[in-house]
Curated annotation (Swiss-Prot):
This is Glutamate-1-semialdehyde 2,1-aminomutase 2. InterPro entries: 4pyrrol_synth_GluAld_NH2Trfase (IPR004639), Aminotrans_3 (IPR005814), PyrdxlP-dep_Trfase (IPR015424), PyrdxlP-dep_Trfase_major (IPR015421), PyrdxlP-dep_Trfase_small (IPR015422). The modification N6-(pyridoxal phosphate)lysine is found at K268. The gene is hemL2. The keyword Lipid metabolism does not apply. It catalyses: (S)-4-amino-5-oxopentanoate = 5-aminolevulinate.
């Protein structure tokens, strides 16, 4: 494949944009460096770069493009919205319609509020939980990414009795001291954290299905135990469904798993590809937010006409019967084929999959927590990534990220992907 135009544009980007990218996850630093491929357009399950190369896309903008790129129903909705003005700063009927659709899909949303990103949604749920409980500390799980606000950029201490440390320059130690980080799927360490700090903990922030160190499901009974322990100590449970909402089930991970949180944060996945976030939950908790309560949150772009109408159009598409069965069918086909190739070529790898999302980990061990994900072979993944890229398969440039299948993918796409996987394994 020729990447000369991508390389030339990236050289310009390096001169004009910090680090050459507008999000570190787009850099190829984690896969051995080099200029990231610059895309020109997306259509269905495919990307086309500035050199004219075509890719089967499994990045899907890190998950939200469930319908595939440039889905006509969503595109037309955005065009209609833009023709009537892109930003009002006033209420619109579309934000009411979209809120009602979210409430219908996810019953825990007794009240909902729109914001502009998943980071903003999570940040606000933490503020609301603190206001409601009158407490300051938060529990999060190791390796789970919840955006880039200070309170969630915190690494684990040496154990559940130890408070966190900053995971980024610029995060004050005083902020990190309000966060306890414990391993996902380890209910005993979770209980120990409450033993030490139970009357200080405002809320527990959890991805009900992990999507940020690959796809990792909770152990049976884990989320139920999280609810029980948190509520017995007067703490709230906050679900981060920025990745999981509408990806595995129309009602979100909480509906699929049958566990109800107190608050939920949403992000990119609900917006059909446009910037968006939302949070919601129990009415008595949400009424602590302005203008009804003393907890302040606002945003000029919140509930803007473009994002609202794109979100409505997205839900209209994916609510159709068979959406999730189709994603599961293609996911199973891809997983089965890859496992056969792993065995055929004696590749040291494991796959975690849930419906239309999966991760390949280069390790002999099944990954169930962040420590295990961190220990996987990053060099092997980097080689695999480059080999797949040169065969027209677009993946996230990180061993921690998932592959996302869309309703635009076909069985032929899966077969073509498996051919590329086999060619890659032959060279590893």
């Amino acid at each position: 494949m020729n990447f000369s135009n991508s390389e030339a544009i990236q050289n310009r980007a390096n001169a004009a944009i910090l680090g050459g990218v507008n999000s570190p996850s787009r850099s190829y630093k984690a896969v051995g460096g080099g200029a990231p491929v610059v895309m020109a357009r997306g259509e269905g399950a495919y990307f086309y770069d500035v050199d004219g190369n075509k890719y089967i896309d499994y990045l899907a903008a890190y998950g939200p493009i469930i319908t595939g790129h440039a889905h006509p129903h969503i595109t037309e909705a955005i065009k209609r919205a833009a023709e009537n003005g892109v930003l009002y700063g006033t209420p619109t009927e579309h934000e009411v319609v979209f809120a009602e659709m979210l409430q219908e899909a996810i019953p825990s949303l007794e009240k909902v509020r729109f914001v502009n990103s998943g980071t903003e949604a999570v940040m606000t749920t933490i503020r609301v939980a603190r206001a409601y409980t009158g407490r300051d500390k938060i529990i999060k799980f190791a390796g789970c990414y919840h955006g880039h606000s200070d309170l969630v950029l915190v690494a684990a201490g040496s154990g559940p009795s130890q408070l966190g440390t900053p995971d980024s320059a610029g995060v004050p130690k005083s902020v990190a001291q309000e966060v306890i980080t414990v391993p996902f799927n380890d209910i005993e360490q979770f209980k120990e954290a409450f033993y030490h700090f139970g009357d200080q903990i405002a809320g527990v922030l959890v991805e009900p299905i992990v999507g940020n160190f690959g796809i990792v499901e909770p152990h049976a009974g884990f989320l139920e135990a999280v609810n029980e322990v948190a509520h017995s100590h007067g703490a709230l449970v906050i679900y981060d469904e920025v990745i999981t909402a509408f990806r595995f089930c129309y009602g979100g991970a909480q509906d699929m798993l049958g566990v109800k949180p107190d608050l939920t944060a949403f992000g990119k996945v609900i917006g059909g590809g446009l910037p968006i976030g939302a949070y919601g939950g129990r009415q008595d908790i949400m009424e602590h937010v302005a203008p009804l309560g003393p907890t302040y949150q606002a945003g000029t772009m919140a509930g803007n006409p473009l994002s609202m109408q794109a979100g409505i159009a997205l839900l209209e598409v994916i609510k159709a019967e068979g959406t999730y069965d189709y994603l599961d069918k293609l996911g199973e086909m891809l997983e089965t084929g890859m496992n056969e190739l792993i065995e055929k070529y004696s590749i040291k790898a494991n796959i975690n999959r849930l419906k239309g999302a999966m991760t390949i980990y280069f390790t002999d061990e099944k990954v169930e927590n962040y420590e295990q994900a961190e220990a996987t072979d990053g060099e092997a993944f980097a080689k695999f990534f480059k080999l797949m890229l040169h065969q027209g398969i677009n993946l996230a440039p990180s061993k921690y990220e998932a592959w996302f299948i869309t309703i635009a993918h076909t069985e032929q796409d899966i077969q073509d992907t498996l051919i590329a996987v086999e060619n890659s394994f032959k060279q590893m």
